[in-house]
Swiss-Prot record:
Pfam families: DHDPS. Aceneuramate binds at residues 47-48, 167, 189, 191-192, 208. Keywords: Carbohydrate metabolism, Cytoplasm, Lyase, Schiff base. This is N-acetylneuraminate lyase. GO terms for cellular component: cytosol. It is found in: Cytoplasm. SUPFAM superfamilies: Aldolase. Belongs to the DapA family. NanA subfamily. It is an enzyme of class 4 (lyase). InterPro entries: Aldolase_TIM, DapA-like, NanA, Schiff_base-form_aldolases_AS, Schiff_base-form_aldolases_CS. One of its GO terms (molecular function) is N-acetylneuraminate lyase activity. It catalyses: aceneuramate = aldehydo-N-acetyl-D-mannosamine + pyruvate. Pathway: Amino-sugar metabolism; N-acetylneuraminate degradation; D-fructose 6-phosphate from N-acetylneuraminate: step 1/5.
Amino acid sequence: MAKALQGVMAALLTPFDHQQQLDSESLRRLVRFNIGQGIDGLYVGGSTGEAFVQSLAEREQVLEIVAEEAKGKITLIAHVGTVSTAESQQLASAAKRYGFDAVSAVTPFYYPFSFEEHCDHYRAIIDSADGLPMVVYNIPALSGVKLTLDQINTLVTLPGVSALKQTSGDLFQMEQIRRAHPDLVLYNGYDEIFASGLLAGADGGIGSTYNIMGWRYQGIVQALREGDVAKAQRLQTECNKVIDLLIKTGVFRGLKTVLHYMDVLSVPLCRKPFAPVDEKYLPALKALAQQLMEEKA
């Protein structure tokens, strides 16, 4: 199973319609688009998927739809994290029921939980996942949970934990984790340092911009396998030019707008309180969509 979890995993967006409801047909198209561009797997219901502005029922519905479209074709990881242990357990049980390959959970946030409470939270989710491997999700910039290296080392050695999504710019820590845990599946979480993360020891990555240019990230993996660091750097630079624009537009709404121009998503909206893309960026996003479609063809 550890080998199956390695690779380039798109952090899947969640499409909504003009009434702010889940757009299931666009979701299905997005899953098929990702499969078609050679993604190794999907990370479903995470930060990129706007999980924390969805109800539990909606999150379960997303898991069900994605499984219907992709089960058996690519690796599927269900992010089931919430502040509530019981709700996370409910989502973990759903992931097992729908045939996902693994579950993942961000560290519980907002309240100042003790580290032992964090550990108990993960143990409970792992138990409810009924044998599915756990991917611990460390994203201190958004969760506000600043784990020490020793705490990370403890979490990844809990029974049932097989992987870590390390969304941090600390590449020294990435290398330290890899050195301490050679058999751990280690994901780079920040797209803009994907190549550097691989060189620091990551097995692959989970990222939002893979939704629109996953083949570039696969190209970085292949270039480094072949020892062509210069090519990997060039591809990373091309990815980062896109990320520069998306940071200006707002990453999730920018990605959805590009996918709208690619005829993948019917509506390019995020769920409120996220606002639509500023109209001044639409020409640049449309040009980017055209460029990527030509590159992918």
